Each structure stands twice: as structure tokens, then as C-alpha cells.
Amino acid sequence: MYKLVLIRHGESTWNKENRFTGWVDVDLTEQGNNEAQQAGVLLKESGYTFDIAYTSVLKRAIRTLWHVQDKMDLMYLPVVHSWRLNERHYGALSGLNKAETAAKFGDEQVLVWRRSYDTPPPALEPTDDRAPYNDPRYAKVPREQLPLTECLKDTVARVLPLWNESIAPAIKSGRKVVIAAHGNSIRALVKYLDNISDDDIVGLNIPNGVPLVYELDEDLKPIKHYYLGDQEAIAKAQAAVAKQGKAG
């Protein structure tokens, strides 16, 4: 049996302000830093250790991983940074307040943009300052692979090559893997691992800073999964994530 640990970054400044963040590189809040540190303490106290880590190229996930490594005394851990683990790109919604957007377009439309599987928000213009084309962290990524908006289906399509080519082989070789990423890149992995339907994935919410453990068989099929920590607090955090896109 193999174990895989997934962690969504701690609360970011734009999580706190209820904004669509996507590929915008915002940092953690004080609470977010604390959540990440607590995740590291919890993992260490629960007897976990790791051989390799994966994260995105966005600082809120990178810093979350740093805190986990620090609290586990694993600062030497090899780390793979990949744009493929970035948050889903929210296109022209990037930076907008979720409740204000819901008041303008309606709760139902915003829920479709946030949570449907295959409906992306309106795209950025290629000349928009928020477009990834001139960002040095994507200099080696072919332009045609860089999104101007994404739905979850698009996010799954870009995450899976990293899973198939790097993460899954690492797990099968016996390496203990931790992934510090984002709500939607983790939803993409969970959808794939648990074979969740396009309709049911709409209801899946990933809380900030809580380790999600997958126990996998020899074919990397899930045996079971569970969050580490206070289960009542985790359920409240998931409900709060679900509520973010509503006008009220």
C-alpha cells in the first residue's frame, strides 16, 4: 500500500477578500501561514515523512510547503515546482470579488463558472496584464499551452501529464510524496483518483491547509482517503468554501 498526501495552501490574501485568484500570485495571510504550520506539525505528530514534494509556481502553495517542511524538519526535501499544479485560471474573473460578481451575474451563473466541470469563465484578452505570456515563470512553457481561462476539465487535462509522467512513477518507486497545491488542481487529482463524475465534482470542496491522505493500492487505486485533524472543524471549513461564490 502507498500513501499520498495532498494539501491545499493556507488562506491567501484574496481568499480572505473573497476574490477569484487563479494564476495571480498572492501571498498567505497570517492565518494562512498558521494553517500551513499546523499542517506540518500535524503530519509530524501523526508519524508522516516524505522523500519528495510537488508544488505549483505560485507563492501561496510554495510557502505552504515551506512551512510544512520546516515543521517536519524536512527543509532538504527535493521539490518539483510545476505550472501544471497551478490553480485553475479564472480568466476575466481574476481579481473580482466573488459575492459582487454573484450580485452582478447571479448566483447560478457564478456557481456554473466556479464549479461546473466544462464551462470556463470569460477569457482574458491576450494583451491583458494578467495574461501569463510575459511572466518569466512560464518562459519555458509553449505559448499555446498557457491558458487565458480554464474550466475544471482544462485543469484536469494539464494536471494529469504531471501525474502520469512524474508523480505516479515516484509513488510506485516507493517514494513518499506530498503535494502542496490549490483548490482546483487538487480537485482535478481527486476527480481522477476517485473517478468522480463530471456532475458530482461540482459538490467537492477542499479546505485550506488541511492534509488529505490517500491510501492507494499497487495500481494507485484508492483504498480510502481521509483528512487529518479535527473533523468538525474540517466540515465547517468545507462549507465555508462552498459558500464563497454567493451574493448573500
From Swiss-Prot:
EC numbers: 5.4.2.11
Domain of life the protein comes from: Bacteria
Keyword field contains Nucleotide-binding: no
Family matches, as NCBIfam families: pgm_1, PRK14115.1
Assembly behavior: Homodimer.
Family label: Belongs to the phosphoglycerate mutase family. BPG-dependent PGAM subfamily.
Stated name of the protein: 2,3-bisphosphoglycerate-dependent phosphoglycerate mutase
Gene coding for it: gpmA
